[in-house]
C-alpha cells in the first residue's frame, strides 16, 4: 500500500469581479424578434461581449446560461450558442434553469467557482423568447405516437395510429406560463398578494411611470452604449414608453382580475418579452493581466423558497414573496441593514410585487412572525430604487433579467466611484434569488 499523500491546501477565496455586460435590446413578444430563436439571441448577446472585450479565440473557464421556455432541440442551448461565437471551441458551457432567477443564479454559480480558484473567468447570462414558443402536439396524440413507436410490428404501429382522431391534429398544446400546482398565472397570484397587502392601484401605476421615466433618461444620457448590442434592427427596448403618463396608465383595465377589485393592468405588469443578456466575471488577477478595469464585485448572495400551497391561510405565503426571506438572510451574513445600500435593484415582475415586498420589510408582525426578526427591516430610500428603470419599462425575458440587472448595477457603482447595491429577483415556484454588489 502506497503512503498517503496529502492534497495541496485549498487556496484562499478570491474576490469575484464583474467586468462588464452585454445584452440585446428587449422586445415585446411577436414584434422585432418574432422569428429569432433562443440560440440566435443568446449567441448575439455573448458575441457582443466577446467583441467588446476582444475575447476572440480565447478559452474561458466556462459559460453558463439558461432559458425558461425551451424547445427540445435546445437541450444544450448554451454550448451550441458558444460554438456559434468566436470564443474558442474549447470553452465549456452548460445550461441552468431557476425560472426568473436563472440569469442571476448563473452568475452566482460561476462566481463561486472563480472565488474557489476553480476557474479564472466566466460568462453568465440568460435568454428567453415567448415568440418562438414550443408548441406541442395534443397530449392524447402524443401518447398515441409514443405507443406506436413502442410497437415492434407494422400491424401494431397501424393499430396504435388508428386511434388518431382528426380533432387531435388541430388542437395543439400551447405553452402557458402558469403554476402547475395551482393553475394560476403569475399575474393572478400577484393579484392575490396585492389584495392581501392592500396595495393600491395608484401606487402600482406610479411605480410603472417611474420605471419608464428612469429608463428613458438612462437611454438619453447614453448609459447603455457599452452594455448593449443592436439586434434585428432594434437599438433600444421596444416596450419603453417615454410618453407614458399616470392618466394613460389609469385608463387601462385590469387583466388578471377583471372585477372592480382588480388592480394589475398591462401597464403595471411586465409583458411577455424576448431577449438575452450576459455578464463577464473574472478574478482580479485575470482582469489585471489584461488591463480590464473592474466595475464591481459580487460579494454576497442568497436564495429562498416559500410555501405558497399551504392549506392554512395563515401559513400560506404569496408566490412572489421569497425575496422577502432571502434578503434578511443575506444581510445577516454581511452584517448589514437594509438601509446600507446606495442602489436597490428590485426586479419589477409586477409593480404590486415590488410594493408587497417593500411593505413586508416594513411590517413588524411579518418580520417577527414570518422572517424571525426582532425588528422590521424598515423602509428604503425610494430615490435609490431602480434608478435606471427596470422590467416594467424594458420588459422581462425571464432568464435574461438577472444579467441585465447585474450589468446595470455594476456600471452604476463604477460611475459613482464606489458603494453597494442590492439585487432582488422573484421567481416562479415561490422562489427568490438575491445578491449584493460592492465597489
Where are these regions (language model features)?
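N-terminal extracellular/periplasmic Venus flytrap/periplasmic-binding protein-like
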Residues: 6-7, 22-24, 34-44, 52, ...
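Flexible glycine-/small-residue-enriched beta->alpha junction loops
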Residues: 121-192
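Conserved beta-ketoacyl condensing-enzyme motif
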Residues: 34-152, 222, 228-238, 339-361
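Conserved catalytic cysteine-centered active-site region
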Residues: 67-122, 165-169, 181-185, 243-271, ...
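Active-site pocket-lining segment
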Residues: 306-393
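Short, well-ordered amphipathic alpha-helical segments that serve as non-catalytic structural scaffolds
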Residues: 38-53, 77-81, 106, 186-193, ...
Amino acid at each position: 500500500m502506497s503512503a498517503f499523500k496529502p492534497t495541496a491546501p485549498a487556496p484562499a477565496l478570491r474576490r469575484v469581479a464583474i467586468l462588464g455586460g452585454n445584452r440585446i435590446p428587449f422586445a415585446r413578444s411577436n414584434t422585432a424578434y418574432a422569428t429569432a430563436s433562443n440560440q440566435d439571441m443568446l449567441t448575439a448577446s455573448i458575441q457582443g461581449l466577446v467583441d467588446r472585450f476582444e475575447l476572440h479565440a480565447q478559452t474561458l473557464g466556462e459559460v453558463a446560461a439558461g432559458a425558461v421556455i425551451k424547445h427540445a432541440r435546445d437541450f444544450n442551448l448554451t454550448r451550441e450558442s458558444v460554438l456559434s461565437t468566436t470564443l474558442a471551441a474549447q470553452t465549456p458551457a452548460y445550461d441552468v434553469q431557476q425560472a426568473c432567477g436563472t440569469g442571476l443564479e448563473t452568475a452566482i454559480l460561476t462566481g463561486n467557482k472563480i472565488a474557489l480558484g476553480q476557474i479564472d473567468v466566466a460568462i453568465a447570462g440568460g435568454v428567453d423568447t415567448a415568440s418562438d414558443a414550443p408548441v406541442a402536439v395534443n397530449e392524447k396524440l402524443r401518447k398515441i405516437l409514443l405507443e406506436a413507436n413502442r410497437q415492434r410490428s407494422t400491424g401494431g404501429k397501424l393499430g396504435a395510429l388508428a386511434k388518431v382522431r382528426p380533432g387531435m391534429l388541430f388542437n395543439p398544446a400551447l405553452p402557458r406560463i402558469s403554476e402547475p400546482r395551482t393553475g394560476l398565472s403569475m399575474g393572478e397570484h400577484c393579484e392575490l398578494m396585492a389584495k392581501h397587502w392592500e396595495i393600491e392601484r395608484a401606487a402600482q401605476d406610479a411605480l410603472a411611470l417611474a420605471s419608464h421615466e428612469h429608463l428613458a433618461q438612462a437611454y438619453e444620457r447614453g448609459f447603455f452604449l457599452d452594455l448593449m448590442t443592436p439586434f434585428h434592427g432594434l437599438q433600444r427596448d421596444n416596450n419603453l414608453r417615454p410618453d407614458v403618463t399616470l392618466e394613460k396608465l389609469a385608463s387601462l383595465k385590469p387583466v388578471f382580475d377583471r372585477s372592480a377589485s382588480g388592480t394589475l393592468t398591462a401597464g403595471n405588469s411586465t409583458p411577455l418579452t424576448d431577449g438575452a443578456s450576459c455578464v463577464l466575471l473574472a478574478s482580479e488577477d485575470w482582469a489585471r493581466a489584461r488591463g480590464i478595469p473592474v466595475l464591481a464585485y459580487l460579494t454576497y448572495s442568497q436564495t429562498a423558497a416559500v410555501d405558497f400551497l399551504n392549506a392554512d391561510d395563515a401559513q400560506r405565503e404569496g408566490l412572489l414573496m421569497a425575496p422577502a426571506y432571502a434578503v434578511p438572510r443575506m444581510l445577516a451574513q454581511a452584517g448589514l441593514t437594509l438601509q446600507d445600500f446606495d442602489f436597490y435593484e428590485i426586479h419589477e415582475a409586477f409593480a404590486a410585487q415590488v410594493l408587497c415586498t417593500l411593505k413586508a420589510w416594513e411590517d413588524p408582525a411579518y418580520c417577527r412572525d414570518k422572517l424571525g426578526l426582532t425588528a422590521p427591516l424598515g423602509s428604503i430610500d425610494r430615490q435609490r430604487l431602480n434608478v435606471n428603470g427596470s422590467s416594467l419599462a424594458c420588459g422581462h425575458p425571464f432568464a435574461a433579467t438577472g444579467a441585465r440587472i447585474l450589468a446595470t448595477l455594476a456600471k452604476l457603482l463604477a460611475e459613482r466611484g464606489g458603494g453597494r447595491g442590492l439585487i432582488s429577483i422573484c421567481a416562479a415556484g415561490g422562489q427568490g434569488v438575491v445578491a449584493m454588489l460592492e465597489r
